[in-house]
Structures are given as structure tokens and as C-alpha cells.
């Protein structure tokens, strides 16, 4: 099976490495020639996964046509905010009925669309068969062969079962479900809560506060998800609770790092410019806040993070507001 992987960041590279290790014919499409050279010559991604050895069968290219030629599966791992433009530019090269799997986590800020909705809109007429893979999975640990469990959402149960087998290895266990919307929203909203958790940790608020944020963040995730047609039970799984816990507590979490740096007094623009990788939660906060207002969903943590990130509010003031809201039943 030939698989075209779009996006040579840490997660795209990790999944390409995983699939190449299974014997799949994988082509990794990357815009940076230095990354292409590193993957093909040194079997390393020098920009995003420096020091980690990649499978020698993995090949990278800057040529989208080369990556897509004869591909059975398109695995999209480009940043969410770039997904629409990438799909639009590649559409003439895509065949009808192609399997498109997203491993990106976020919501488009302009149109408030999930990746699945963007695929449906941009590839209309090509009848793409869509799936999304998500869950608690730091890229470096996947490349290192550490045990990882994720979930693959696909409305077509049979296709979901096939893709589950494609992605599974002895160290990368893939479950499947049919709630595509729930899997996508869990992977997006958890990044907003992770920034809040990092901010809380950085301000020295302790373990109690972090646990409270994770738990109430899960409630917000489910509240918005159900309003948008997802199943509440999905958020108790790997793409919801699992990814939320990892992203709020793990030191490799980019979104948690944003919160920590905000707490240290750094400005948001400087943080984003200095990270070298995309922290999806910054843009996703804006999108989730807008979705909540549109759907009439009460998301107080998201509202507070929007005020901090986009209105310049003092984090300590927002914590005070969260803690002194009207009391209610859980």
C-alpha cells in the first residue's frame, strides 16, 4: 500500500516512520529541503526530531506530485490553519474516492470548520473517504517505540477497521470508532485546556488546581461536543480524556509550554515566534470560543483563556473570576 504523508513536522514524521517500519510504501511531503535531505540521507528529521533515528525505507520529497503518485491513502498532518489551502492546491492531483486520514488537531479560525469539514468542502466531487486519528501520543515517544494507544474515527465501520490494521503495530495500538466529530473535537479542545494547565502550573497554583482544570476542561469538551453532534462517551476515551491528561501534564506538550511561558511573563507573540513548532491551542482557543458563543455552550475555562490570549487580561484576575462564579451542581 502506498501512503502519502503531508507534513514533515514531528507528528507527520513520526507517523511516516511508523508506517514505513511496517513495510508500507511511504512518501513524506515536506516543504523544507533541509528536512528532506536529513530524512533521506541521515534518516533523521534535523528540525523536529533531532537525534532520533528514522526507518531507512522512509523517503521524503519536496515534490507533491512525487509524494501523491499512485497513493492509496493521503495522511494529512499539516497544521490545521493551513489545511484548506493545502487541500485546494493538491486537489488536481487527487483521485476520486481517495482515503484521506487526518492527524491534525485543531479548528479553522476563519470558517470554524474541523479538518473533516474542510476535506468535504475542498474535495467536493471527489467523494473522499475520511478518517481521523488522534489520542495521547507524543511524536518522540512513538519514534522511540514506546507503547502508545490512539483511536481512529471513521463513519464507515469497515474502512475504519481496515485503517485500524494499517496503523497498528506491537507498540502503537489503534482502536476505532464511528464518532468522527467527537474524535476531532477532543483533539482540538484539549489544547485550549492544556494552555490553561501550563499557566496554572507556571503561576504555582499546585496539583489541586491542575486536576480541577483537567476535570472541568473535560466537561467543557463534552458540552461543546454534544452541542455539535458528537457522542458524550467519546470524550471519555483516548481522543478526549486520554489526550487531555497527556497534554496538560507532559513536558513535551507545546500547548502546556505556552501556558508556562505566559506565566513567566513572556508575550504571546514572542512565545509563538520562539517555539519553532506550531502550538495549535493558540488559534484553537479563538475558534472554540467562537463556536461556544454560536452554539450557546457555557465554556468558562475557554472563555478565560480567550481573555488572556486575545484580550490581554491578567491570568490571575481570570483565575479569581473562575473561582468566584455562581455556585452550581456539578
From Swiss-Prot:
A GO BP annotation: glycerophospholipid metabolic process
Biological role stated in the UniProt entry: Catalyzes the reduction of the glycolytic intermediate dihydroxyacetone phosphate (DHAP) to sn-glycerol 3-phosphate (G3P), the key precursor for phospholipid synthesis.
Record NCBIfam families: PRK00094.1-2, PRK00094.1-4
Top-rank lineage group of the source organism: Bacteria
Gene that this sequence comes from: gpsA
Lineage: Bacteria, Pseudomonadati, Thermodesulfobacteriota, Desulfovibrionia, Desulfovibrionales
Residues reported to bind NADPH: 10-11, 31, 105, 139, 254, 278, 280
Record-listed sn-glycerol 3-phosphate binding positions: 105, 135, 137, 190, 243, 253-255
Pathways per UniProt: Membrane lipid metabolism; glycerophospholipid metabolism
Intracellular or extracellular location(s): Cytoplasm
Catalytic activity: sn-glycerol 3-phosphate + NAD(+) = dihydroxyacetone phosphate + NADH + H(+); sn-glycerol 3-phosphate + NADP(+) = dihydroxyacetone phosphate + NADPH + H(+)
Keyword annotations of the record: Cytoplasm, Lipid biosynthesis, Lipid metabolism, NAD, NADP, Nucleotide-binding, Oxidoreductase, Phospholipid biosynthesis, Phospholipid metabolism
PANTHER family: GLYCEROL-3-PHOSPHATE DEHYDROGENASE (PTHR11728), GLYCEROL-3-PHOSPHATE DEHYDROGENASE [NAD(+)] 2, CHLOROPLASTIC (PTHR11728:SF1)
Active-site annotation: 190 (proton acceptor)
Any GO molecular function: glycerol-3-phosphate dehydrogenase [NAD(P)+] activity
Pfam family, one: NAD_Gly3P_dh_N
Taxonomic source organism: Nitratidesulfovibrio vulgaris (strain DP4) (Desulfovibrio vulgaris)
UniProt family annotation: Belongs to the NAD-dependent glycerol-3-phosphate dehydrogenase family.
Name assigned to this protein: Glycerol-3-phosphate dehydrogenase [NAD(P)+]
